Amino acid sequence: MAARREPSSDDESYEVLDLTDYARRHHWWNRLFGRNSGPLTEKYSVATQIVIGGVSGWCAGFLFQKVGKLAATAVGGGFLLLQIASHGGYIQVDWKRVEKDVNNAKRKIKKEANKSAPEINTLIEESTDFVKKNIVVSGGFVGGFLLGLAS
C-alpha cells in the first residue's frame, strides 16, 4: 500500500501572473505579426539600423529628385508657354488684378498661419517622439536621403 504524503508548503504555492507587466512586454503587433516584429531598436543592431535607414533614405531621395525634376520641368514649361502666348498677343494679362489677388492671398495665409491647428501640433510632437526613439534609423535615413538627392 502506498504511503500517503502530506502536502508540503511548496506544493500549495501558486505563481501570480501580473497581466499589466505581460501586456507591456507583449505588444499587439507581436500577436499580429509574430515575435520578431516591433520597434527597430529592439530587433536589430546599430549597424543594421543605419543600413536600413540609409537604403530607405537613398531610395526616397532618388525618387524625390526624379519627381522634382519632372515637376520643375512641367511648371517651367507652363510658364514658358504662357510667356510665349502673352508675347504673341494670344493672351492679355491684367497685372494689376494679379497683384491684387496675390496680396489678398498673402493676407489670408498670414491670418491662417497665426492660428496653428492642434492637428499640426500633434503631428509635430509625434514626429519628434519617433525621431527621438529611432535616432539611429533617422540619422541613416537623412544621410541616405541626401546621397539619393546627390546621385
Swiss-Prot record:
Its main location: mitochondrion. The keyword Membrane applies. It comes from the Eukaryota. GO terms for cellular component: mitochondrial outer membrane. The gene is fundc1-a. The chain crosses the membrane at residues 44-64, 71-91, 130-150. PANTHER family: FUN14 DOMAIN CONTAINING, FUN14 DOMAIN-CONTAINING PROTEIN 1. This is FUN14 domain-containing protein 1A. Acts as an activator of hypoxia-induced mitophagy, an important mechanism for mitochondrial quality control. Disulfide bonds: none annotated. A motif (YXXL) lies at residues 14-17. GO terms for biological process: autophagy of mitochondrion; response to hypoxia. It holds the Pfam family FUN14. It comes from Xenopus laevis. Belongs to the FUN14 family. The keyword Transferase does not apply. It is a multi-pass membrane protein. Keywords: Autophagy, Membrane, Mitochondrion, Mitochondrion outer membrane, Transmembrane, Transmembrane helix. It is found in: Mitochondrion outer membrane.
